[in-house]
Amino acid sequence: MIKLVATDMDGTFLDEAGQFDMERLKKLLHSYKEKGIYFAVASGRGLLSLEKHFADVKDEIIFIAENGSLVRFHGQDLYEATMPRDFYLSTFEKLKTSPYFDEKKMLLTGKKACYVLDTVDETYLMFSHHYNENIQKVASLEDITDEIFKFTTNFTEETVEVGEAWVNEHVPGVKAMTTGFESIDIVLDYVDKGVAIVELAKKLNLDMDQVMAFGDNLNDLHMMQVVGHPVAPENARPEILELAETVIGHHKDQSVIAYMEEL
């Protein structure tokens, strides 16, 4: 029997406008509580952004944020993986040697805030505000006093995959993954949604066969591999569709919540 349901956000749980039906979710969460089913949101977004999206029900949801770098439930951090200061500073120096990297299109997410350089591309900054809360400008990354979870950086549609490959080949200790929207997330090399959901299942004393996950993109790949019941919307990447036990309708038609209601 399914005891934990986790879903990606963009391209999966959210519709094309980046929205969902809150009243429908409230009814679902009430039903899940009676059935003893946990609900988790697993996203590359930061915790502050997720809590804002789900403000009305945030105490009833498990948040797997920052592409698996942080798991929070009832205000407690069940799992976290942050980059030491020297590590993220040296990682930045290495990234600057990439022919695909543009520091004006880079954001770091931390526990207290998100950070961009004060030379940030303003179009990129506007884009980033859609997915991140409390973005602060700094003159140098050395000015940051926060704990850092990940880098996010944008490429062009033509260079995002080769840029991701460059990071994975040339920058030690990190893992880059495409998140959609021509961007990649760069996290510690042992971090992803799959690792986080395995750790969460352990905390909840669940077997992975009791876990269902919905995802559409490559940052969902490991999560879809480790859960007992991977489900993908029809708009998912081919690599995700191949892993799926079940393929459902397009995310724009709220297919994920409809499927969840049938459990």
Listing of model-derived features with the role each one plays in the protein:
Residues 33, 96, 100, 168, ...:
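Anion (oxyanion) recognition and catalysis
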Residues 20-122:
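Active-site phosphate-binding/coordination module
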Residues 94, 101-214, 221-222, 235:
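Conserved acidic, metal-coordinating active-site core of Asp-based
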Residues 1-4, 22, 185-263:
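Mg2+-dependent phosphoryl-transfer enzymes with acidic/Ser/Thr/Gly-rich catalytic loops
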Residues 57-59, 67, 170-172, 226-227, ...:
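Short, structured coil segments at secondary-structure junctions
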Residues 9, 45, 215-217:
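Active-site metal-binding loops of divalent metal-dependent hydrolases
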Residues 32, 67, 151, 224, ...:
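Residue-level signal for inorganic ion chemistry
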Residues 3-18:
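Asp-based phosphoryl-transfer active-site loop
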